[in-house]
Amino acid sequence: SYPVDDDSIRPRRLIAYGGHGICMGFWGVTDGEAGHMVILETADDAAVRIDRTAGRLVAAPEWDAQKGALGYPRRLRYVFFDRGGHVAMCKRYRAYAKSVGRFRTLAEKRKACPAVDRLVGAVNVWCWDRDAVGLVREMQAAGIRRILWSHRRPPDQVKALNAMPGVLTSRYDIYQDVMNPANFTHLRGVHSDWPTAMWPDGLNLDARGDWRRGWRVHGKDGTMYPCGVLCDLLAPALARRRIAEDLKGHPYRCRFIDTTTASPWRECYHPDHPMTRTDSRKAKMDLLRVVSGEFGLVCGSETGHDAAVPVAHYFEGMLSLGPYRVPDAGRDMARI
């Protein structure tokens, strides 16, 4: 929240269809008691514009096109309050979320996935130390009892970690980026999660018919090589195959799916798998549902969006003060 006269806040546009915009489809203005809020009831192609009028912040809705047209009836709801301030707004949006099926507590999710108990209160550890079991023992001896181990390990270590009380085993996974195999010789390594077979027919195409650029990788020659973005419609089937094979030898109880709730819902113009942003959202949620529903795993994703509340258990980055990694976050230890 920001005071309307805070001149450090620059005008901006926040999409409602991705984690790096507004993660819940509402905003409001209050004097501490009275105020109003706006609920975006058709949020898949919507955004909020934050600007200044007479030196004060104002917010207004914007509608993005669906495949170049309005596409469908757009709907938003204004709600006015005489008391309650931001708490009343949050309660009102909570009621709306319940009415559209987006409200699901961890207690409810625990009934379907008992491993959720190991998630609650756990520190999220990303560590590339080879002796994961020894490090976890050391952490627990130091008083850190509940640990989400997020880096993939060999089967024997996963099994040993599973046998330790308070430990939730997980690994990284991603269903967005596909590198052109013609670039492999220029790279320092080939990511094991790139679904190379999806190049080029599985790529998301923009309105010009060009493949969308995703994550970029440093090449040995200093050039940045972009991945293509996989069409979201193809991700759930890919995940079913990959996760089923992985779990045969690696009994993880959790899986972190990168980018799914951080990247925006995207249109695709490929003739074999066209989609609107609404289709994209549904496919992304289907992907997470494969993890949590079909395989019964604790499911995490990046940044977070309330569309994923029914199918995900946690988000990385939701509590960060800024998007992405801040310059002095500590990961770049050679520089800091």
Region spans (language model):
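The substrate-binding groove and active-site-proximal loops of carbohydrate-active enzymes
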Residues: 118-129, 142-151, 215-240, 265-280
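Short, low-complexity, polar/charged sequence segments that are solvent-exposed and flexible
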Residues: 97-99, 168, 188-192, 274-277, ...
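Substrate-binding cleft/loops of secretory-pathway carbohydrate-active enzymes
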Residues: 181-189, 265-268, 300-336
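Short glycine-aromatic motifs
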Residues: 141, 162, 195, 310-311
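Glycine-rich loops and low-complexity Gly/Arg-rich segments
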Residues: 85, 101-103, 194-197, 279-282, ...
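Carbohydrate-recognition beta-sandwich/jelly-roll modules
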Residues: 1-179, 253-254, 288-291, 298-299
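Active-site-adjacent "subsite" loops/lids of carbohydrate-active enzymes
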Residues: 171-245, 328-336
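Active-site neighborhood of glycoside hydrolase catalytic domains
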Residues: 231-303
